A protein has these predicted regions:
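Domain-level signal for Mg2+-assisted phosphodiester chemistry and nucleotide/NA-binding surfaces
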Residues: 1-95
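Extended two-metal-dependent nuclease catalytic cores across DNA- and RNA-processing enzymes
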Residues: 29-30, 56, 80-242
Length: 243
């Protein structure tokens, strides 16, 4: 049976955020509360809706581990998220998901990586995620209640777009002054992964930045794919450029 690989943390976080409320108390205190009962109902409904889109698929929900290899690649990775408050009881909610669904996680990587490592288009697998980063993984994806097919070229192009423009939410900057429009212009004539990497390197060099720095950004942006994780030794294999 083919698998639908689901971003458990993304859907779980959304369900929690949808049912978070401010509460004012008589003594002038304000608190944030999350209605876990409604959040669980919302999450369950979301999983049922995903299952209805591809009813012949088994759902496996991907979680990340507490460690992340990207922290050693680029120490500032996701450091900006420390200041953001998470919905109350999020960890407990994730435990509930683990207790009620089939889940998968690997040491040292994020849930997105677990999906990228396992999702196999040739097996008929489907990817369900709310995160645009998963568009860097080729294969069949759920989007707007339907299915779309992302080719290897499209996935590679999305990856190099991320390498060039960075990701503010993940805390890696990419090439200074290069936003999505400029990144698309840099890559417009590149037809292969090798040409995309060459164009990316040239853009970094024009900013007086080294190949090593560009490689750091690429390894932050890279959602691991099949063959890029050593399952026997439980460690990620750092992305190598196509040169």
């Amino acid at each position: 049976m083919p698998t639908m690989w689901v971003d458990a943390e993304g859907y779980g976080y959304r369900a929690m955020a949808q049912h978070e409320y401010e509460t004012q108390w008589p003594n002038g205190m304000w608190t944030y509360v999350v209605d876990h009962h409604r959040a669980k109902e919302a999450f369950t409904k979301a999983m049922e809706e995903l299952a209805d889109i591809a009813p012949d698929h088994a759902l496996v929900l991907a979680f990340g581990s507490t460690s992340n290899f990207r922290y050693s690649v680029f120490p500032q990775y996701k450091s900006n998220r420390v200041k953001y408050r998470k919905p109350a009881g999020l960890s407990d909610f994730y435990f509930w998901i683990r207790d009620n669904w089939i889940t998968q996680s690997y040491e040292g990587v994020e849930g997105d990586d677990v999906i990228g490592i396992n999702a196999r288009a040739d097996y008929g697998d489907v990817i369900a995620s709310l995160d645009k980063d998963l568009k860097t993984i080729p294969g069949v994806h759920i989007e707007r209640g339907g299915l779309i097919d992302i080719s290897v070229y499209e996935a590679d192009h999305a990856f190099y777009m991320q390498v060039l423009s960075g990701d503010a939410s993940d805390g890696y900057p990419g090439a200074p002054g290069v936003g999505p429009k400029r990144a698309a212009d840099i890559l417009k004539n590149a037809k292969t992964a090798e040409e995309m990497w060459a164009a990316t390197l040239e853009a970094y060099e024009k900013k007086h930045l080294s190949r090593e720095y560009a490689l750091q950004m690429a390894r932050c942006a890279r959602i691991l794919r099949a063959g890029e994780y050593d399952l026997d030794n439980e460690r990620p294999l750092l992305w190598q450029p196509p040169e």
